[in-house]
């Protein structure tokens, strides 16, 4: 009985398996005509079953095209799959007609689908973003120099281009870079660390920690090239505070979102190279939400990735 804004109503659900929509014979969305212009729209809907609509918006002159809503199938069945691989395998086998997936597909899966007879693939940038959050209520996330050091050593461009094969683009803020009139130039630590190689990023991150009052028994070193850094030992924050052990970076698993899953592994490793005991933990999306957004848990986590 839930209200819907479409020509269908919820029909039945089998938990963990499927749910169905049934066509609503009294819908207002059947038979109406919509005309699209360059800078305007005209809507003329009067099917005798719902209040008539006849409205125009914007500039309704010049070239246009029209389409009529409907007819609709009687029932739509949504089969529920646990991950992308299972869903797209069903698609390739003809078991489902389309896949609803707001997260995009992995590059190898995209290439695989492009080779399926009768399937045409189109690639465009997703309208979304992924982010990593520090818990600024607790140490070490509460320390600005720590956050800046992690931002510096994290070579996002390397992961995006070399590991994820360019399926996403780097963002240094929440405003899409295409909106050039609104995006301020990158400054500060992000600008200072842009374009640095792995050795330079490590050394710069250590400098940031030292300038922020961090100390270490041995600050470690980086041999250059693709080698991992020899991590600092005995590292302590300002005032001699020892970072916690067994800190977790929560991120959705690879079956749900391979982009965040992959990035979390690299960022956790970079934090380890700075002497922090951090592990990437694949976790269900809703589990992460419950863990980090409830007041009673507000100090029980250190890092997470969502979007």
Label each region the model flagged.
Residues 14-16, 62-66, 77-138, 149, ...:
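Extracellular/periplasmic solute-recognition and catalytic clefts
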Residues 72-76, 130-132, 245-247:
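Short amphipathic alpha-helical segments
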Residues 74, 97, 300-302:
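Conserved acidic residues
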Residues 9-12, 16-67, 142-273:
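Append "and occasionally in soluble cytosolic enzymes with long acidic Gly/Pro-rich linkers
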Residues 12-15, 67-72, 114-115, 125-127, ...:
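Extracellular/periplasmic catalytic domains that process cell-envelope and extracellular macromolecules
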Residues 1, 5, 131-133, 143:
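A structural "hinge/loop" feature
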Residues 248, 272-307:
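Periplasmic binding protein-like
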Residues 117, 230, 289-293:
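Alpha-helical scaffolding within the catalytic cores
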């Amino acid at each position: 009985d839930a209200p819907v804004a479409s020509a269908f109503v919820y029909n039945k659900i089998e938990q963990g398996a499927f749910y169905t929509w049934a066509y609503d014979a009294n819908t207002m969305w059947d038979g109406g005509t919509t005309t699209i212009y360059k800078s305007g729209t005209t809507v003329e809907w009067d099917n005798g079953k719902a209040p008539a609509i006849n409205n125009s918006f914007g500039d309704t002159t010049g070239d246009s095209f029209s389409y009529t809503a409907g007819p609709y199938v009687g029932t739509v069945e949504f089969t529920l799959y646990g991950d992308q691989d299972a869903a797209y395998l069903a698609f390739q086998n003809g078991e489902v007609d389309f896949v609803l997936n707001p997260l995009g597909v992995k590059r190898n899966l995209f290439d695989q689908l492009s080779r399926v007879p009768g399937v045409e693939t189109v690639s465009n940038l997703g309208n979304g973003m992924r982010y990593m959050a520090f818990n600024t209520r607790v140490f070490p996330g509460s320390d600005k120099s720590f956050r800046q050091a992690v931002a510096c050593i994290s070579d996002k461009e390397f992961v995006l281009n070399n590991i994820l094969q360019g399926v996403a683009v780097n963002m240094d803020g929440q405003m899409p870079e295409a909106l050039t009139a609104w995006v301020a130039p990158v400054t500060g630590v992000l600008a200072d660390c842009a374009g640095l190689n792995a050795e330079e990023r490590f050394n710069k991150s250590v400098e940031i920690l030292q300038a922020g009052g961090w100390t270490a028994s041995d600050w470690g070193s980086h041999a250059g090239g693709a080698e991992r850094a020899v991590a600092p030992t005995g590292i302590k924050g300002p005032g001699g505070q020892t970072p916690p052990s067994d800190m977790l970076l929560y991120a959705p698993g690879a079956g749900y979102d391979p982009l965040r899953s992959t990035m979390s592994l690299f960022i956790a490793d970079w934090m380890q190279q700075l002497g922090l005991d951090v592990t990437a933990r694949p976790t269900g999306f809703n589990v992460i939400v419950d863990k980090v957004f409830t007041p009673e848990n507000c100090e029980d986590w250190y890092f997470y990735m969502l979007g």
